[in-house]
């Protein structure tokens, strides 16, 4: 059986960011673009919440900001089809999830296979899901951290791109651990996007190789 191989494009790319809240990772990516570190432009900032602070930030920065209320749609599939239409209209190369609190449907995942990136505040495959910083504390983990990965049909199970570890301190709370992990998120997410548009990411099966 031939193994599927994907190599990211070496080009000036077009990014769509999906967010549900403040979008601090969106800001980190955009600031890396403005500094010249990432060879891309953010062509769409999308949210499922019209009041999301990240949308306001996008508008203040002169970026194309769009929101769609999920309620009028019959189901998740129809909602994601509407999002995909917005993405197609802008000829997007990479979708970045930045605190987007809705699960991407399998149809969306398949259409943009190896072109949807996410960041997770734990060292995957340990602690998928929500409230993972508290889980790391409760389980007595000595280290936690964050992971960038491509989005697959199974939640938090896509190919891992980069990881950064932080120690879990004995007096850590969910808030203090989250804050230290967030600092690392703001480093490895822009770095992952940079590598993508330098044509340096190769995916073979479920493994990522940096070229």
Would you name each region that the model predicts?
Residues 47-48, 71-72, 76-77, 90-106:
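N-terminal glycine-rich "phosphate-gripper" loop used for MgATP/nucleotide binding
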Residues 64, 93, 142:
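Residue-level detector of anion-binding/catalytic polar loops
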Residues 2-53:
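N-terminal Rossmann-like dinucleotide-binding module
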Residues 32, 98-207:
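Donor/substrate-binding cores of folate-linked one-carbon enzymes
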Residues 66-71, 119:
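Short beta->alpha connector loops at strand-helix junctions that form conserved
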Residues 61-62, 112:
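Short, structured coil segments at secondary-structure junctions
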Residues 43, 93, 114:
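Conserved acidic residues
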């Amino acid at each position: 059986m031939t193994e599927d191989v994907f190599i990211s494009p070496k080009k000036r790319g077009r990014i769509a960011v999906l967010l549900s809240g403040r979008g601090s990772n969106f800001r980190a990516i955009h600031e890396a673009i403005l500094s010249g570190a990432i060879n891309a432009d953010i062509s769409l900032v999308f949210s499922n919440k019209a009041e999301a602070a990240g949308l306001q930030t996008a508008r203040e920065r002169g970026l194309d900001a769009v929101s769609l209320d999920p309620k009028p749609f019959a189901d998740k599939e129809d909602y994601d089809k509407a999002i995909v239409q917005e993405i197609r209209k802008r000829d997007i190369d990479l979708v970045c999830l930045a605190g987007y609190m809705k699960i991407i449907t399998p149809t969306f995942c398949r259409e943009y296979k190896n072109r949807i990136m996410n960041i997770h505040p734990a060292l995957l495959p340990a602690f998928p899901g929500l409230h993972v910083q508290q889980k790391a504390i409760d389980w007595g983990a000595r280290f936690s951290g964050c992971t960038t990965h491509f989005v697959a049909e199974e939640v938090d199970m896509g190919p891992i791109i980069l990881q950064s570890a932080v120690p879990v301190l004995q007096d850590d709370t969910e808030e203090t651990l989250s804050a230290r992990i967030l600092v690392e998120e703001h480093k490895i997410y822009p770095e992952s996007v940079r590598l993508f548009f330098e044509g340096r990411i190769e995916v073979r099966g479920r493994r990522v190789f940096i070229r």
